[in-house]
UniProtKB/Swiss-Prot annotation:
Entry keyword Disulfide bond: no
Pfam family, any one: GST_N
Protein name: Glutathione S-transferase
Reactions accelerated catalytically: RX + glutathione = an S-substituted glutathione + a halide anion + H(+)
GO BP terms in the entry: glutathione metabolic process
PANTHER family, A to Z: GLUTATHIONE S-TRANSFERASE, HEMATOPOIETIC PROSTAGLANDIN D SYNTHASE
InterPro entries hit by this protein: Glutathione-S-Trfase_C-like, Glutathione-S-Trfase_C_sf, Glutathione_S-Trfase, Glutathione_S-Trfase_N, GST_C, GST_superfamily, Thioredoxin-like_sf
Domain of life: Eukaryota
Function per UniProt: Conjugation of reduced glutathione to a wide number of exogenous and endogenous hydrophobic electrophiles.
Segments of skewed composition (Low complexity): 1-33
Positions of glutathione binding: 46, 77, 81, 87-89, 101-102
Amino acid sequence: MADEAPAAPPAEGEAPAAPAEGEAPPPAEGEAPPAEPVKNTYTLFYFNVKALAEPLRYLFAYGGIEYEDVRVTRDEWPALKPTMPMGQMPVLEVNGKRVHQSISMARFLAKTVGLCGATPWEDLQVDIVVDTINDFRLKIAVVSYEPEDEIKEKKLVTLNNEVIPFYLEKLEQTVKDNDGHLALNKLTWADVYFAGILDYMNYMVKRDILEQYPALRGVVDSVNALEPIKAWIEKRPQTEV
């Protein structure tokens, strides 16, 4: 094809041609060009464990987002605690502003890396699953952290015989109904959240809770096999939980 001649400049007093579709207009005379978008800075504060922060680390890894992974020691925590929004962790600092609530932080990161739904209705489907997983985790935690041995033994019977099977059977069926995922028939942050929090739940009950739930195991294995998350797992600090 022959080369096209360059467009003639506008005549004196004539308005310049409009920019092509999708093209940013040039700055007006004497006006500075638009600034480059500011890159967000992220810092995650938590103890040197996976637990509640690991889903957040998974989401950072999935999105290839750089962040500072601050692992606070027990000795450092008393001095740091008053500086946190609610005196607890995990806490996420974004551009110098600190926020708490691990589920809300995970949802924020999921939106950032494109793992949410395409509509409010789809987001609701994902949120329902994540909140159900969190309810499940809390029921395990209540028993795991019970200080009285005799009471704990009684609670463990109900937990193992009723609570754990109830939640896992429901979630197992959810995966079967969603083409191997926990929502929307595709990878969402519900899958990533579950894979990230599983080690903590296993730690609290001292066993692999997915032994009899192959569909859920498939979700976790698929997430952990994603290249950026696999790379994170290989390099992360080795901790008991």
